[in-house]
Amino acid sequence: MILNYIEKGCGRPLILLHGNGNSSRYFKKQVRYFSAKFRVIAVDTRGHGKSPRGEGPFTMERFADDLKIFMEEMGIEKADILGFSDGANIALIFALRWPERVGRLVLCGANLSPDGLRFLPRLSFKLRYRLAKDICKDPKKTELADLAANQPRIDEKWLSRLRMPVLVLAGTFDI
């Protein structure tokens, strides 16, 4: 699968991963800013932006697999990775599976499981997913809602395996 991406600058690779339903364009200002010191690569994940959907179900693990293949195809052995929302979940799963490929990790609004969301947003995601699933019988049309309602599933104990510098950002009013 060939993922679409925006690339600017040179130097140490910095990969930016957007959230559910967004695209690399989400990071337009960050690409411009960080490209003064980094080789910035903002990726459209599978089925987002201009990247094809591909086959099989959407899972955070599949997105992490896609990132590994993308890095190999781009000739990137190791990169700093910044993820926002579901992009942070993908970055975290990637770092847990291939820690040697991550220099530094920045997680903005990540969650270990859907249970990490506040009650009302979690309920909203679950209800929208169930409603979409009942109305639309095509699983490909409900998969973004499924990501929000049912993923990721990261065991808190796994976090102790991270050895790279990690910056976690979360806001008081995050969902």
Regions found by a protein language model. Give the residues of each.
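The conserved SAM/SAH-binding core of class I Rossmann-like methyltransferase domains
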Residues: 15, 41-43, 84, 108, ...
